[in-house]
Regions:
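Active-site palm subdomain of RNA-directed nucleic acid polymerases
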Residues: 5-23, 48, 125-154
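Conserved pre-catalytic core of RNA-dependent polymerases
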Residues: 1-117
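Short, conserved phosphate/pyrophosphate- and ester-handling motifs at nucleotide-, phospho-/glycolipid
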Residues: 119, 123
C-alpha cells in the first residue's frame, strides 16, 4: 500500500514539476551521477568565467528522523496532497510510539512526533517534500546548490 501511495505522490510531484531541480536522489533520472555531472559543469563554468566558487558539503545526520510531522503535513498540503490522501498520511504518522530496551530495562512509551518510516516505500518521497523548501529558499537567494537524499536502509 505504501509503495502505491508513494508512486502516486511521486508522479504528482514530477508531473506538476513541484520539486526543485536542485534535488537529486529518489527522483527518476536524477541520481548521484546527475548530481556530480551538474556540479562539475557548474564548477567548470565558474573556472572558465573566472568567477568565485564556494563549496560546502553538509551531511544531515539522521535526516529522515528529523522530519517534524506537523511541518510535513503543511508541506504536503502546500504541494497539493489533500483530502483523503492527506488524512490517510496523517493517520499513518499519528499515534506511533516507541520504547527503548536496555538489557532488562524498558523506557516509558513515548509518541513519535518526528521521523518518516525508514525502509518504507513512502519515507523517501515524503523526505523530498519536506526538504524542498530548503532548495527553494537557496534558489530565491541566488545560491546554486545540489541536494542529494539517500537512505541506506531503503
Amino acid at each position: 500500500m505504501e509503495r502505491v501511495i508513494a508512486k502516486h505522490i511521486h508522479d504528482h510531484l514530477q508531473n506538476n514539476r513541484l520539486l526543485s531541480d536542485m534535488q537529486h536522489g529518489f527522483i527518476r533520472e536524477r541520481s548521484t551521477c546527475t548530481n556530480l555531472f551538474e556540479s562539475m559543469n557548474d564548477w567548470t563554468m565558474s573556472v572558465t568565467c573566472k568567477t568565485g566558487i564556494s563549496v560546502a558539503y553538509i551531511d544531515f545526520s539522521r535526516a529522515f528522523d528529523s522530519v517534524t510531522h506537523v511541518i510535513l503535513f503543511a508541506c504536503l498540503h502546500k504541494y497539493g496532497i489533500q483530502g483523503d490522501l492527506l488524512r490517510w498520511l496523517t493517520k499513518f504518522f499519528t499515534g506511533r510510539t516507541h520504547q527503548t530496551r536496555v538489557g532488562l530495562s524498558l523506557s516509558a512509551v513515548a509518541e513519535l512526533l518526528s521521523g518518516v518510516v525508514q525502509g518504507s516505500g513512502i519515507g523517501p518521497v515524503l523526505f523530498l517534500i519536506y526538504i524542498d523548501d530548503l532548495a527553494k529558499w537557496l534558489e530565491s537567494h541566488g545560491i546554486t546548490a545540489k541536494l542529494f537524499a539517500e537512505c541506506r536502509r531503503c
